[in-house]
Amino acid sequence: MKVDFVVKDAWVFLTYRQCFEKRDVAVAGEKIYGVSPAICYPDATIIDGSGMYMIPGLVDIHMHIESSMTYPAEFSRITLPYGVTTVVADAHEIANVFGMDGIRWFMGQETLLDIFYA
């Protein structure tokens, strides 16, 4: 596996220990490849993570995007910088107003988040 970059010395939230610890994080493509106190991939780009914090992506399991008074593409642009990577959306309000056409329009939007519709 070719590692694209390594974030060195970041404070990484370890979910299994429920705390932050200094770690190196190796990334290959769009996936985290490894987390360790010391990672060495000579061909990888190094990013200095000193003083930075890393957490797993946040998942909002019940969201009414239309209640935010915006649409899915804009909602994802606003929330992603705060760590939200995935949303389970209940689009009943858009369905009440526009029916299936509204739901299809909502679901057809390109977003930066993973959005699942319930």
Spans of features found by a protein language model:
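N-terminal metal-binding scaffold of metallo-dependent hydrolase/deaminase domains
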Residues: 1-41
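Alpha-helix N-cap/helix-start motif
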Residues: 20, 68, 96-99
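Short, low-complexity, polar/charged sequence segments that are solvent-exposed and flexible
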Residues: 25-33, 65-66, 77-80, 106-108
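Divalent-metal coordination cores built from histidine and acidic residues
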Residues: 73-118
